[in-house]
Amino acid sequence: ESFAVARPEKIFAETSPDGRVRLSFQLHTELEDILDCRAALEIREKETGKPVFSAAYPVKLGPGETEYMFDARVDSPELWYPAGYGKQALYELRLQIFSGMREVASFRHRFAFRSFEIEEKRFTEKQGLFQFRVNGIPVFANGGNWVPPDMLPGTVGRERLRHLIALAAECGYNYLRVWGGGYYESDDFYDLCDESGIMVWQDFMFGGPEVPEFDPAFRAECRREAEEVVCRLRRHPCICVWCGSNETDEFYLVDRNCKRERPGGYYYGWTLLHRDFPEIVRRLVPDAVYIPSCPFMGTAAPAGTENNAHGFGTCHTQWLPQFSPDEAFDRTVIPTFMNEFYGMCPVPASSVKRFLLPEDLDCYCNPVFSAHNMLEVQRNDEWGQIFRHLCFHDPRRRFDVPLAELLRGFEICAEELMTRYLALLRRNRKYCGGAG
């Protein structure tokens, strides 16, 4: 991007799978008079550099900010598909604006052609379907949740992101949910997902708490942030779902321990997630899919169905109940879309040895290790369930088994449990649209 007279902003190429392109952008100038200019637009295939469209348009530059919109068409475009379903075809446009022979502004913009929708069905009163369709093809979303790779965003560069995305692709991922308790990732992350065919479910960064939307200044700030995020990220074909928050509806509309009795029966933050954000997404990305919060009951569930009912919409659950006997396990209601598949497992012993002395590796109950164990602080029983399974329901064994050996057992246990549950989901793809 460059400019001598006009600064380009809010660039977006809205596309249709039939090859239509509508390029919109703003130009900001310090001019005092109108300037007659010419815009030259060229579109090329990103991989080969082959030109597929070119045209010129008259442009008038004026003082301040001016919005522009150009229409173009690419004949028989290649479509973008998630990994395992087709090619990740990308295109790049270049726009140059000239006053006479002088270039006054230019920019490049990468985009793709694809369609996306969510298919929902109801098979029984307890079992439905929630499934992605990309370019009309049903897709099983196979992936996980993306949490910040580091507490300090500035330490995560493109090469580290490339390594992590490559690991995800190597594991067979075609889907990542950017969890709403983290932060918005850099453009590098989304560029790499575009190139790798990894679909992205993008949460807005609201991780569960109520927020003071009744304060006009705070609400306006949240709206501005959402607009900036959508404008920055909307060009990426990898982003298929925009979601207002992580678990906020679940906390304050369903959970009996957190349910709020506010005026109108809503929690503080409901207006942002259910009115403001969907309006912003529809306005800035007209064909985008928006969901107010996850878990999400969906539209196919019978009236009165609770949020996070595993047979409809999206759900969050842990894999620890998979300790149950086979006959009970196989009677489980099949989750239609497992969007948060959690279960606590410790880091490898090699990592623990970086912050513990050898004498503190004697057993799990060592006070130094306990000081680093947040689950103990929270009195969370998830590790306790693994202990009961791993130690054959004899809690005294946690004092006898060396810590490194116990941590290795935890890893094996977690791997077996997740494998068992993922196998259940994959062999029931008639009902399950994805696992993250």
Language model features with spans:
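Secreted/periplasmic carbohydrate-active enzymes, especially glycoside hydrolases
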Residues: 1-176, 184, 195, 334, ...
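A generic "alpha-helical surface" signal
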Residues: 89, 133, 159, 220, ...
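Substrate-binding clefts and catalytic carboxylate motifs of secreted carbohydrate-active enzymes
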Residues: 242, 279-282, 291, 298-301, ...
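Short secondary-structure boundary/capping segments
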Residues: 257-260, 305-310, 352-356
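Acidic, His- and aromatic-enriched active-site or binding-groove loops in soluble protein domains
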Residues: 202-209, 310-328
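Short loop/turn segments at secondary-structure transitions that flank enzyme active sites
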Residues: 2, 117, 147, 248, ...
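Active-site mouth of glycoside hydrolases
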Residues: 31-32, 121-303, 435
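Short coil/turn segments at secondary-structure boundaries
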Residues: 9-12, 293, 353
